[in-house]
Regions:
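Extracytoplasmic metal-acquisition and chelation regions
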Residues: 19-297
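General N-terminal leader/first-domain-start detector
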Residues: 1-2, 22
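Bacterial N-terminal signal peptides that target proteins for export
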Residues: 2-11
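Bacterial N-terminal signal peptides
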Residues: 10-20
């Protein structure tokens, strides 16, 4: 997604607003005893909170239920970012991030591109690194380094929290490794190609209805080829996700006799999910259970 004069106008407006906010005590809602961290979208926010614990106040820019690939910051969102001491973002999902940081350069915000150098797979750039526990561990380690840099007083707590959370990610890694190794099938089908890193890291093969972007629409030819492949591979489940329209995934399932199930790319958590007490770890456990079922039938 390329930004036009609209984005530039927003950034200019942001600078004006930030000057007004600075002179009017606009940060009163922030707890000054805590490190102020802005996170681009849900998984980044959860990783920050897991490491930061009681010593951080996390602002998530992309709201609950929104698709982060489609989301663009408003002037209000950019103002919220301008109040942060640390900004954690994945990379590639947030094409607006670099321009926003450049406009806010005088704020001395510490930027953390948690997914940097992890994106390439199969010669392509794929941002969905957080859905692989192996790469999520790397992201958490980078977030830990940034929090320690920004807040030296609580380094020991950040490192202890990080070790505890990474131990839980390592347990997910172990579970997924066992599922993938023991499964008679190695192919699974998803609504969009959000699980390529997971597939690559665990010796599986992802087939997708749409491309890496959730916005991508498959052509009739793409659909026909996928339907043929699903029948040939005897795939019993077509996975869809919670934040996008499942109609195409359901069409493929209908044409092939497969069932549908959820494989959540963890791009966001809606209000219902929060009410249920869901989080990254619990949703990944559900994903692993659903994958296990699909790969063994």
């Amino acid at each position: 997604m390329k930004y036009s004069m609209t984005m530039k106008a927003l950034l200019l407006f942001l600078l004006i607003i930030m000057n007004i906010v600075s002179g009017c005590g606009g940060q009163q809602s922030a707890d000054k005893s805590k490190l102020q961290v802005a996170a681009s979208f849900y998984p980044m926010a959860e990783f920050v909170q897991a490491v930061g614990g009681k010593n951080v106040q996390v602002t998530t820019l992309v709201p609950d239920g929104a698709e982060p690939h489609d989301w663009e910051p408003s002037p209000k969102d950019l103002t919220r970012l301008g109040r942060a001491q640390v900004f954690v973002y994945n990379g590639l999902v947030e094409p607006w991030a670099e321009q926003a940081l450049e406009a806010l350069s005088e704020r001395k915000i510490i930027p953390v591109e948690a997914g940097r150098a992890l994106f390439t797979r199969g010669g392509k750039q794929d941002p969905h690194v957080w859905v692989s526990p192996k790469k999520a561990i790397v992201e958490v380690q980078r977030i830990t380094e940034a929090l320690c840099e920004a807040d030296a007083k609580h380094v020991d707590e950040y490192k202890a929290n990080s070790r505890a959370y990474i131990a839980k990610l390592e347990q997910l890694d172990k579970q997924l490794t066992e599922v993938a190794q023991k499964a008679p099938k190695k192919v699974f089908v998803t609504a969009h190609a959000a699980f390529g890193h997971l597939a690559e890291d665990y010796g599986l093969r992802q087939l997708s209805v749409a491309g890496i972007s959730a916005e991508a629409e498959p052509t009739p030819g793409d659909l026909q080829r996928l339907i043929i492949t699903v029948k040939r591979e005897k795939v019993r489940y077509v996975f869809f996700e919670t934040l996008t329209d499942p109609k195409i995934a359901k069409l493929v399932a209908q044409e092939t006799g497969a069932q549908t199930a959820v494989l959540d790319p963890l791009e966001g958590l809606d209000e219902e999910g929060r009410k249920q007490g869901l989080n990254y770890l619990k949703i990944m456990e559900q994903n692993i259970a659903n994958l296990q079922k699909a790969l063994n039938e």
